[in-house]
Amino acid sequence: MDLVPSSTLWSIAQELALYLAFTVPTAFVIITTPKSSFLRLAWTPCLLYILYRFSLQVPSLTTSQFLNGVAAGQATVAALQCLNLLLITKLDERELVHAGLCIPSSSLLVRVACAWALLVNFRGIGTVWEVKNVPQHAAYLQKPKQHRLSRRRYVLRESAIIIWQYLLLDLIHMSTKDTPPGDLARLFGPGLEYRYLDATAEQWFGRVSVGIFSWLVPSRVCLNIVSRIYCLVLVVLRISAPESCRPSFGRVRDACTIRGFWGKFWHQSFRWPLTSVGSFVARDVLRLPRPSLLERYTNIFFTFFTSAVLHLACDAILGIPPSGSGAMPFFCVVPLAIMFEDGVQEVWRRVTGPSQGAVPFWQRLVGFLWVGSWMYATSPWYLYPAARQPPERTWMVPVSVVGEIGLRVAQKVLLVYGVVLYWAIGGEI
């Protein structure tokens, strides 16, 4: 692998230009038009066309399915956020001024920049639109009697964690890259994602590795390292303060329910645009009574349905056709799991009375077993197509350190370095 081929640099430059070509004009429209302006609707097909042009370029960025997926996901959710702020939430300059994000006397360029910053702030951190359950900074960064976080401590901690995560992703790829194609076909071949009772022991192990382990380690770290690098650059360049760059993932302890897995443990980067669509359909289109169980679960369903459409689009950009993607069934059954566990919890409360204090350990253990079983059963629908990719498309880091020092040395370095990190800078799992 070349480090940065000139063709890749040119492709990245083109993609950045296209990304700005639909986000910056959207910010301009938000600032300069009233909420009901026809121009907002007229801009929508232009926005979608630019996104389409962006999608055509993604496969030429790298040979890495992961990195191309990050690019496709970032652009797709940015486009959805544009539509959200223009047509659903319908923000305008007055609301941005009222929220303290811009000053009317500022130049047009400054006001557009403020709108653009809000647009790409998918979690709305530090604004009145901040989504729920955004994780707080680690205790290591939050010193007593200090209202602001130390930029130096933030940069040091994030840099150290990024190095560890880089080594981990490198180790995972180098450990699996020599898997024979026959083994991949036997474990993750087409149709095996829906095989349960007649699966072999080896295939059951494959379901565990993809359905449970991949969410806890490779998938989480893949997305987390991108977020950390992005925030680190913003803080180093003093574009953002450390306070605005909160962690992207929650703690594993929050994943003892399906609702907690998606609402607290997993990243909330898409939550604002996704929940806006769900609320819009349930309350404005269907006009369901609020509050009501029907409105609540309809909202949840359309939130996950929109997420399924986004992931389906990303798969298509990466060359996985809709017929070969399991995004739609995987995400659309999540509301059923949430309804089931809500019902069980409600019955339990009525039988035992309101809970007092912390949730008992045995209940949390049952919760983890439930979540693990659900992810084991359904995750292969969505993740197996990616697991079938050949090794030359599964690399996650541009330069392999593990390839130079060897697997055994890398394992020891990763273990020692991880322990030091955990105790020295407040590692959190």
From Swiss-Prot:
What membrane topology does the annotation report for this chain?
Multi-pass membrane protein
Q: Where is it chiefly localized?
A: membrane
Q: What is this protein called?
A: Acetyltransferase pyr8
Q: Which InterPro entries match?
A: Wax_synthase, Wax_synthase_dom
Which keywords has UniProt assigned to this entry? Acyltransferase, Membrane, Transferase, Transmembrane, Transmembrane helix
Top EC class of this enzyme: transferase
- Give a single Pfam family match: MBOAT_2
| Subcellular location field | Membrane
What EC number(s) does this enzyme carry?
Answer: 2.3.1.-
Q: List the disulfide bonds.
A: none
